[in-house]
Amino acid sequence: MLTLTRQQQRQNIRWLLCLSVLMLLALLLSLCAGEQWISPGDWFTPRGELFVWQIRLPRMLAVLLVGAALAISGAVMQALFENPLAEPGLLGVSNGAGVGLIAAVLLGQGQLPNWALGLCAIAGALIITLILLRFARRHLSTSRLLLAGVALGIICSALMTWAIYFSTSVDLRQLMYWMMGGFGGVDWRQSWLMLALIPVLLWICCQSRPMNMLALGEISARQLGLPMWFWRNVLVAATGWMVGVSVALAGAIGFIGLVIPHILRLCGLTDHRVLLPGCALAGASALLLADIVARLALAAAELPIGVVTATLGAPVFIWLLLKAGR
């Protein structure tokens, strides 16, 4: 038994090391790749100072943090709701951020600065989170809370569709592209949004013990003494914050929160002491690679990163499911 435990620990360490190396390679490639390839030896030239440090570095940091936040949010939701299909958009938080953004554009008549739009997106996500917490205070079961989130997401999606359909504003129509996900407008002015993600990410990565209890199921977690009401509220609030900030930075990006945790579980990473940091590393790496493809696929334009993640990730996910089912 002890030998099996040590073998599992060594395998977990190897996985984390491999994911760390993959993320470092993706970081280097993200800084080098673009319309002009800039090798590391040219990073401190005048051309490198402009393209690498002023344009590519803030974008790379945003992609890294958003990828980690979405993947960890997916892992948290899948444990909280005991559902492998749970993901950050499931509770309606992503759509709530979109409603906040569209409301800001309508009320501000397209004159609000980007930082104000970002704040409105976060506010929309937090409003949906507060509504969910209101439901949670009534001590609803996990399945009922999940259904409440799905219903809120449908309502927010309908509101966005109505607003965009009847709008004649060019800015509002351009938001449809933004809601498909993209990091094209990210620079150092959005650094406050990046900093807002770091404390929550680090805190959740340290909560492996309650997450392992939640993964056993609601009844087992209660029997082990876990205060379900407290942890449900805290985790829903933390997830709402991370998703709201991520949508404010890059729009709605699918696939990462759904598939990354599931892929790691198929690979044998079930302990949240390893799964949570593994999700952060794998989510960051996957989104960095998708961002590179989005930048380089077309010569005169940039693809929405949400389209890239779905196109590249869905076949891989299906292949892994078929492989696991054999």
Swiss-Prot record:
It comes from the Bacteria. This is Vitamin B12 import system permease protein BtuC. GO terms for molecular function: vitamin transmembrane transporter activity. Keywords: Cell inner membrane, Cell membrane, Membrane, Transmembrane, Transmembrane helix, Transport. One of its GO terms (cellular component) is plasma membrane. The keyword Transferase does not apply. InterPro entries: ABC_BtuC-like (IPR037294), ABC_transptr_BtuC (IPR023691), ABC_transptr_permease_BtuC (IPR000522). GO terms for biological process: cobalamin transport. It is a multi-pass membrane protein. SUPFAM superfamilies: ABC transporter involved in vitamin B12 uptake, BtuC (SSF81345). The gene is btuC. The chain crosses the membrane at residues 15-35, 61-81, 88-108, 112-132, 146-166, 184-204, 240-260, 274-294, 302-322. Belongs to the binding-protein-dependent transport system permease family. FecCD subfamily. The complex is composed of two ATP-binding proteins (BtuD), two transmembrane proteins (BtuC) and a solute-binding protein (BtuF). Part of the ABC transporter complex BtuCDF involved in vitamin B12 import. Involved in the translocation of the substrate across the membrane. It is found in: Cell inner membrane.
